[in-house]
Amino acid sequence: MRVVRLLRLRAALTLLGEVPRRPASRGVPGSRRTQKGSGARWEKEKHEDGVKWRQLEHKGPYFAPPYEPLPDGVRFFYEGKPVRLSVAAEEVATFYGRMLGHEYTTKEVFRKNFFNDWRKEMAVEEREVIKSLDKCDFTEIHRYFVDKAAARKVLSREEKQKLKEEAEKLQREFGYCILDGHQEKIGNFKIEPPGLFRGRGDHPKMGMLKRRIMPEDVVINCSRDSKIPEPPAGHQWKEVRSDNTVTWLAAWTESVQNSIKYIMLNPCSKLKGETAWQKFETARRLRGFVDEIRSQYRADWKSREMKTRQRAVALYFIDKLALRAGNEKEDGEAADTVGCCSLRVEHVQLHPEADGCQHVVEFDFLGKDCIRYYNRVPVEKPVYKNLQLFMESKGPRDNLFDRLTTTSLNKHLQELMDGLTAKVFRTYNASITLQEQLRALTRAEDSIAAKILSYNRANRVVAILCNHQRATPSTFEKSMQNLQTKIQAKKEQVAEARAELRRARAEHKAQGDGKSRSVLEKKRRLLEKLQEQLAQLSVQATDKEENKQVALGTSKLNYLDPRISIAWCKRFRVPVEKIYSKTQRERFAWALAMAGEDFEF
């Protein structure tokens, strides 16, 4: 408890500005060189705590266009006979027909959920006829949409320009809002059209119908004195409110998971930039507390209270393995996903010795978005002994941490540091890991391509830590074959250039004049250029192979302080555009303005 009291005292002194600061130097937050651009837009025009804006005016969301029935020549068949579907049933049939041939349509859960929801949209007489998905034939529907997609690819330049102009007009009308007198870009002004839910991993609700969102489902948020957005003709909004403590412009509840969806500002907006900056500053502040927190939970492994022991072991997993705390679910929710606090005995196996290590814990469970988390990791002996204790006399379905809840853990984290959550730990460890990996992997003398490979390898370590997986892209094999073909062709060019250089060197040795010297230099430069191109292709192939099942983007955009990457780019003379796309650079404009080459997290 002494450490907890010290942490509370330190937090209070920090709020009062009484904690002595170390001298500003390389790698210390607060250094002027690492905090350049203090007059940035996201630091100006501050409101009191909780207030996000004074003025918010916008046009509301853009709704998906109404369904256009299929042409008469495109038919649906049941038991080999054409069946004329009602408009509602036909629309849902097109959702499945579009996906014909996709892996999803081979999954039993997807097929079952789709068919159940589709039958709900059918007329009574249609349900009496269509009783089995196996007897349905969507071939003509599928071919119709394949042909439409092919036709779009061969549009004339004029037709493509017209479509571009229409999209730009839509962007101008719905894609911007006025926030405190400034025009700000909106992130996702289009409401998602109806379709079939896919989910990530083996989601139990895959195939269910995502219903069409209507204006009557949508809550509008804007300032009281602004012009309220006009709903589409013949409709009205569910509600119009003025809540300046939130940053969303419109909200509705989607039909599959009953989760709330929002129209938000673009990530490059002032408010989003400020929120991101504060998020990473909170994680960065953890650096001053983390050693004491770790000492505390290690001491708590020996606590007399079972609740305290369980909390300490859970916090160790959150810290070391970047596990999510796990949100409590409503009774009856279909997806059996868990986090650290809701782990069951069946999700953990203990091995006294495995893989040449002692005290190994094997995790196997479905995490967020039904992504499987599997890991075998050696742990400290007291953690292993405590896990044995927690599992005594429990069945497979019993909670591992039966004295712990997400709520109680979060309350404890707040006591350790103001603003501390499991996600802050995750962000802190992800960012620290990236910084350490970049320091270990990057060599100043490497080529740009080799440095980028080092960066992606560092990013990959973080993605694995955070369990950011993806399925191998369906185009992977083909793209790798194309890349290997390019590499082979480049090798042949290098061999030919090397032979030409040898001949040029022999001619210069024989003639010794200026002309032969010029030819020799030209051949040498050509060989160097081709060798560099070959090296870049080889690095690209290695990078593609290593990351085929790892999603680098999730951690890069959400858990890694962008100032680390920008500082690395500046320090090693790597163009920032090699790491961040144009859209991402706009998103992290605040970091580009703040981070010098000596910034450290």
Swiss-Prot record:
SUPFAM superfamilies: DNA breaking-rejoining enzymes, Eukaryotic DNA topoisomerase I, dispensable insert domain, Eukaryotic DNA topoisomerase I, N-terminal DNA-binding fragment. It is found in: Mitochondrion. Residues 22-48 are annotated as: Disordered. The active site is at residue 559. Residues 1-50 form a transit peptide. Pfam families: Topo_C_assoc (PF14370), Topoisom_I (PF01028), Topoisom_I_N (PF02919). The keyword Isomerase applies. Its main location: mitochondrion. GO terms for cellular component: chromosome; mitochondrial nucleoid; nucleus. Belongs to the type IB topoisomerase family. Releases the supercoiling and torsional tension of DNA introduced during duplication of mitochondrial DNA by transiently cleaving and rejoining one strand of the DNA duplex. Introduces a single-strand break via transesterification at a target site in duplex DNA. The scissile phosphodiester is attacked by the catalytic tyrosine of the enzyme, resulting in the formation of a DNA-(3'-phosphotyrosyl)-enzyme intermediate and the expulsion of a 5'-OH DNA strand. The free DNA strand then rotates around the intact phosphodiester bond on the opposing strand, thus removing DNA supercoils. This is DNA topoisomerase I, mitochondrial. It comes from Pan troglodytes (Chimpanzee). The gene is TOP1MT.
